[in-house]
Structures are given as C-alpha cells and as structure tokens.
C-alpha cells in the first residue's frame, strides 16, 4: 500500500487550494517560493520530537529566530524540547513567554518537556503543577538518572495526579554502573 499520491496542487494566494484552512499562516511565506512545474513534496508540518535549541542559555550559538528559520526552511513547524537546557526548564512561569517568543520570532510552535525532578538531579520531584500551568506538554528527566527506583515511582505518581505524560529512559544506576549489555550469546555468558 502506497502512502504517497502523485497529483497537481493548485496554489491560490500562496496557499494550496484544498488545504487553505488547514495550514498555519506561518508557512505562507515558504509556499510563496514555489515555482510552476517544480517537483516538490506537499506535506503537513513536520514535528521534531527532540530538538536541542540554544535558547535559553546559549544565544551566542543560535536564537529562537535563527533556529525557527532553519526549522521552517526544512518543513518543521512543531518543535519539542527536552528540559536539559541551560538553564533547566523547571520554572513554569518562564515557559509561556518562551513559547510565545518561539512563535513570534521564529515562526515555530514550541512544545516543552519540563523537568521531572528538581534540577534534573533525580532526588526529588520538581513543581509539576507549576510546569503544567506554564504549558508543558509532559515532563522528563532527559537522560539523567534517578537516585533510585523509589524516586522514580514517587515522581510518576505525582505526575499522574496532574495527568502529565512522563518521558524517561529506563536506567537504574545502581544496576547499570558503567556497564553495557548486548542481546545474544555474549550477554548471557
């Protein structure tokens, strides 16, 4: 079964006719550059599920405007960022402004994963109520470990009281240490 359709698209006022109401206005400037007869893909906006933006904290390397321009140029309108930025995304009151600036300056819809534990240290839960109020779509400890499984259990229970989704990597530092395992004969040796 094919997931592509080979068809012509009629562009009117810089927007495809059949999709005029479905496309966000942020892509209108991109569609203005289409040339008649060019072979291009017409896709819904793409989603980057783990983008590493440089703002907040490292604006000397990239701003929301420059990162947004790069994302839009490649078809990405929705960008999800993990909490392990500098500073860590654990303050709900700052998140709304960050999302608004990403849309205004960069033309992208920013979706934020807040910090699951305070400072991403894996010791105690962060203020998940404040993060939800600030507009986080979920919480995560990024790739940082939890102190132990009890901390993980408590943070999962706390996040559940607010209906927050949790993204985490299954790693128990007391078991894994610096080791790795592979499936197969060597792992069971």
Model-predicted segments: where are they?
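N-terminal metal-binding scaffold of metallo-dependent hydrolase/deaminase domains
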Residues: 1-37, 42
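Metal-associated gating/positioning segment near the N- to mid-region
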Residues: 37-102
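Active-site gating loops and adjacent loop-to-helix segments of metal-dependent hydrolytic enzymes
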Residues: 45, 74-78, 97-109, 173-189
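Short, acidic/polar
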Residues: 60-68, 120-130
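Divalent metal-dependent hydrolysis catalytic cores, especially in the metallo-beta-lactamase
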Residues: 66-90, 106-118, 132-147, 163-171
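Active-site-adjacent beta->alpha loops and helix N-cap segments on the catalytic face
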Residues: 88-98, 145-158
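Short acidic, glycine/serine/threonine-rich loops at helix termini
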Residues: 91-93, 122-127, 151-153, 176-182
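Functional cores that coordinate and move charged inorganic groups
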Residues: 136, 152-187
